[in-house]
């Protein structure tokens, strides 16, 4: 163990603690400090993982899937390092290892579950060698950062080929992800849902409309949402692969339930998209060689924190906070909200900071007209781009109120005695809004 590694771990832990005292998250700063002192600290610490390293990539669902995977491995009795907060660029990945290490620089972990931003795989995969990659989906996201989705796919393909023995656990219902897994030559297994579950009412922009092999328009027998579904190419024969972990008898009413490998999985969550998150975590655990006997028990105890369907109780109001950062994710959020038939109020917070992407034209690809139900009492818009959000709603004849300050918006709704409040935010609004809700929850 190099003395520089020990110093880097100590400095990072102190940095993280100071940031928390200042009311900041501090995770990425801890990683940045550690890298500055010891540039190869990620190689040093990741090499101490005794068994296997998972990485989780994809546009939507990374944090929830990664945290479920971690909890599932822990339920099997394993010690796991995980970037629970969703800090998924290089500094955040480094922070997961340094904050999980002892002050001596020793790491006591059987497994690592690491969520990695797709573009950051170029920096992470050159420092660690993953054994498994879980790929959730590939949707359009942050156009000014990623550009067209082909750029993201090219980055992932380049990195996957650098680790040819890494096994990929891929969403077979996504033509883009499935093509990538097939094309790269890595060993892979698939998960998916082979029969339609819900009526697809949205007019979504579908990214995987054309075959990546030959360019022909794909034919779908059904869609689940966005481009996820049962597809085939009429020209070259590319099609949805055989599914290894197939969710059948799927229910998404008051809770999620489905059967996979003759095992009934039940979770007290909402949102059809969560079927995929749960199924991906299950497939990861099974692929690693576990029987997943404790999977349902884990789901009963699992708390989806960090603003992913996170629940709060504030002065009699039930509050749900969720991240919505691109058209596919936002449409699924709207579907989950409208699945709740009780009267509700909604707050939408949209920022355009660097991590969000400055280009917010994606708002025009979200089906906000689905918010036109009778059970919505009010919609309030907030955040840096609240005016743009209000204009977008106006174009589909959805009235809204504007409140620049997020805390004021939340206090007003709770003060008015609303019973159910949904707060939908994009990325940089998430941490601050979560802090506000936790503070309000703690008030007498």
Model-derived segments and their meaning:
Residues 3-192, 200-202, 206-210:
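Phosphate-binding loop of NTP-binding sites
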Residues 115, 136, 169, 277, ...:
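Residue-level signal for inorganic ion chemistry
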Residues 127-137, 228-242, 269-300:
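A conserved, hydrophobic alpha-helical segment in the catalytic core
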Residues 194-256, 268:
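Cys/His-rich short segments
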Residues 203-209, 269-280, 305-307:
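Short glycine/threonine-rich catalytic loop with a Thr-x-Gly-x-Asp
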Residues 238, 251-253, 284-320, 324:
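Gly/charged, well-structured mid-domain segments that form the phosphate/adenylate-handling core
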Residues 305, 323-402, 440-443:
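Active-site beta-alpha connecting loops in nucleotide-dependent enzymes
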Residues 423-444:
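Glycine/aspartate-rich loop-and-adjacent alpha/beta segment that forms the canonical ThDP
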């Amino acid at each position: 163990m190099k003395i520089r590694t020990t110093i880097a771990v100590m400095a990072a832990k102190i940095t993280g603690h100071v940031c928390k005292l200042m009311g900041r998250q501090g995770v990425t700063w801890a990683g940045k400090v550690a890298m500055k002192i010891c540039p190869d600290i990620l190689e040093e610490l990741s090499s101490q993982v005794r068994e296997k390293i998972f990485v989780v990539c994809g546009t939507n669902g990374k944090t929830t899937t990664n945290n479920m995977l971690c909890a599932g491995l822990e339920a099997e009795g394993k010690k796991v390092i995980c970037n629970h907060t969703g800090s998924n660029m290089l500094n955040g990945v480094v922070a997961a290892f340094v904050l999980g290490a002892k002050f001596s620089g020793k790491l006591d972990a059987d497994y690592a579950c690491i969520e990695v931003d797709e573009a950051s795989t170029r920096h992470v995969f050159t420092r660690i060698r993953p054994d498994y990659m879980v790929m959730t989906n590939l949707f359009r996201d942050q156009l000014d950062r990623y550009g067209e989705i082909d750029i993201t796919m090219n980055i992932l393909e380049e990195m996957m080929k650098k680790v040819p023995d890494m096994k990929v656990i891929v969403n077979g219902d996504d033509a883009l992800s499935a093509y990538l897994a097939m094309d790269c030559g890595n060993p892979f297994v698939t998960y998916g849902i082979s029969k339609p579950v819900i009526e697809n009412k949205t007019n979504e922009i579908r990214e995987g409309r054309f075959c990546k092999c030959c360019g022909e328009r794909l034919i779908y027998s059904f869609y689940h949402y966005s481009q996820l579904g049962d597809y085939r190419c009429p020209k070259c024969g590319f099609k949805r692969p055989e599914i290894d972990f197939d969710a059948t008898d799927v229910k998404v009413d008051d809770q999620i339930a489905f059967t996979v490998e003759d095992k009934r999985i039940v979770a007290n969550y909402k949102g059809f998209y969560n079927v995929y998150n749960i199924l991906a975590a299950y497939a990861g655990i099974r692929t690693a060689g576990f029987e997943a006997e404790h999977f349902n028990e884990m789901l009963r105890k699992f708390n989806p924190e960090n603003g992913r369907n996170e629940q709060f109780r504030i002065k009699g109001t039930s509050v749900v906070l969720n991240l919505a950062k691109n058209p596919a994710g936002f449409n699924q959020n709207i579907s989950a909200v409208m699945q709740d038939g009780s009267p509700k109020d909604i707050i939408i917070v949209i920022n355009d900071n660097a991590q969000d992407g400055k280009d917010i034209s994606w708002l025009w690809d979200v089906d906000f007209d689905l918010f036109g139900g009778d059970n919505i009492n009010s919609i309030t818009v907030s955040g840096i781009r609240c005016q743009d959000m209000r204009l977008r709603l106006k174009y589909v004849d959805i009235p809204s109120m504007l409140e620049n300050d997020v805390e004021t918006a939340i206090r007003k709704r709770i003060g008015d005695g609303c019973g159910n409040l949904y707060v939908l935010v994009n990325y940089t609004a998430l941490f601050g809004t979560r802090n506000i809700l936790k503070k309000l929850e703690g008030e007498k």
